[in-house]
Amino acid sequence: MEATAASTSLPDPGDFDRNVPRICGVCGDRATGFHFNAMTCEGCKGFFRRSMKRKALFTCPFNGDCRITKDNRRHCQACRLKRCVDIGMMKEFILTDEEVQRKREMIMKRKEEEALKDSLRPKLSEEQQHIIAILLDAHHKTYDPTYADFRDFRPPVRMDGSTGSYSPRPTLSFSGNSSSSSSDLYTTSLDMMEPSGFSNLDLNGEDSDDPSVTLDLSPLSMLPHLADLVSYSIQKVIGFAKMIPGFRDLTSDDQIVLLKSSAIEVIMLRSNQSFTMDDMSWDCGSQDYKYDVTDVSKAGHTLELIEPLIKFQVGLKKLNLHEEEHVLLMAICIVSPDRPGVQDAKLVEAIQDRLSNTLQTYIRCRHPPPGSHQLYAKMIQKLADLRSLNEEHSKQYRSLSFQPENSMKLTPLVLEVFGNEIS
């Protein structure tokens, strides 16, 4: 043990490839690392240290050219020491007794400090780990990264009237009277165990010459397709929200209020997964479903919404959130006690506090610096940005839906969640 403590070891090249056997340069035994500037075993390291400290003078009883091996290294100390020097071992690397003691004390102090840091470092509780696991599962069940369901929407129509590789697919048509009770439709959507389609729409396999597939070449040609996309996304947000721990403890009225007020914000948050900063677009699997600023404008939105939306997407992307942080942020966004119309604000706040504490603890535990620097504050600022985007979206939506020719292209669920300006 004394020999070990007195050693000064250099970085060991053998650490880069542990499959390569390390051999002592003195006797050929298994080496344990670089000691006193050479690769040696523990035995030869200790022998060299003792010899140098004692200033020992050895004489070879033979011809001064003994071959040193693991088995005979004790037979000729002179040739063993000569071999140590020949391979580069240096007495300058040997610590004095005082230096050895200081080194031991430093090592002990460092271990104690690390143990203290570890004891003070926040850890995710079992409950917090459970919350994260539930939210991850909820997200995976309600977000399809293949975007396969987009093929069931009314086709995207760009300004040249093309629909890309569009071919006749099952088309979406309203069932019954679109002015029927949309509150019932919304409540039905909320109660669905796994919302996977439009509760208010029927899929039918009409032929391509059916009037319902007539391509819209109006200035708002992308409105039907993006209305279906938003309606689909609302269903998925509902499915995600229902799995948030504590959300089901709220009254149905509060659940609906929270979902109506946060739906577009969560859709914007979720869309960040498909957003690419290469060309500032949302890439949803194919060229047909790659959406840029022009596409959004052809659904009736202006630069007053689009520009801050793009800025928001870029800023959120640059945070490089872990998936765990992303799902927690979505849940916190939904469960906000300050939404207008919330009745049991205290219960909503308690649920949100639990989610917020989990997020803060996760960041401290799992998100290494420098990315974690003020990350929680930056994420909360993103929620504030979403409120502004929500307000502008509502303003533009009201203007859009006030026109019957546009309102009729929306789905009942969209009209219910965002409001129907047509009486």
UniProtKB/Swiss-Prot annotation:
Residues 97-126 are annotated as: Hinge. PROSITE patterns: NR_LBD (PS51843), NUCLEAR_REC_DBD_1 (PS00031), NUCLEAR_REC_DBD_2 (PS51030). The keyword Ribonucleoprotein does not apply. Residues 127-419 form the NR LBD domain. It is found in: Nucleus; Cytoplasm. Its main location: nucleus. Keywords: Cytoplasm, DNA-binding, Metal-binding, Nucleus, Receptor, Transcription, Transcription regulation, Ubl conjugation, Zinc, Zinc-finger. A zinc finger (NR C4-type) spans 24-44, 60-84. GO terms for biological process: animal organ morphogenesis; apoptotic process involved in mammary gland involution; apoptotic signaling pathway; calcium ion transport; cell differentiation; cell morphogenesis; cellular response to amyloid-beta; cellular response to vitamin D. Residues 242-260 are annotated as: Interaction with coactivator LXXLL motif. SMART domains: HOLI, ZnF_C4. Ubiquitinated by UBR5, leading to its degradation: UBR5 specifically recognizes and binds ligand-bound VDR when it is not associated with coactivators (NCOAs). In presence of NCOAs, the UBR5-degron is not accessible, preventing its ubiquitination and degradation. Zn(2+) 1 binds at C24, C27, C41, C44. Detected in intestine and kidney. Residues 159-180 are annotated as: Disordered. GO terms for cellular component: caveola; chromatin; dense fibrillar component; euchromatin; heterochromatin; nuclear matrix; nucleus; perinuclear region of cytoplasm. Residues 171-180 have a biased composition (Low complexity). The keyword Cytoplasm applies. One of its GO terms (molecular function) is zinc ion binding. Zn(2+) 2 binds at C60, C66, C76, C79. Pfam families: Hormone_recep (PF00104), zf-C4 (PF00105). A motif (9aaTAD) lies at residues 412-420. Composed of three domains: a modulating N-terminal domain, a DNA-binding domain and a C-terminal ligand-binding domain. The 9aaTAD motif is a transactivation domain present in a large number of yeast and animal transcription factors. Homodimer in the absence of bound vitamin D3. Heterodimer with RXRA after vitamin D3 binding. Interacts with MED1 and NCOA6. Interacts with MED1, NCOA1, NCOA2, NCOA3 and NCOA6 coactivators, leading to a strong increase of transcription of target genes. Interacts with the corepressor NCOR1. Interacts with SNW1. Interacts with IRX4, the interaction does not affect its transactivation activity. Interacts with CRY1. Interacts with CRY2 in a ligand-dependent manner. Belongs to the nuclear hormone receptor family. NR1 subfamily. This is Vitamin D3 receptor. It comes from Rattus norvegicus. The lineage of its organism: Eukaryota, Metazoa, Chordata, Craniata, Vertebrata. The gene is Vdr.
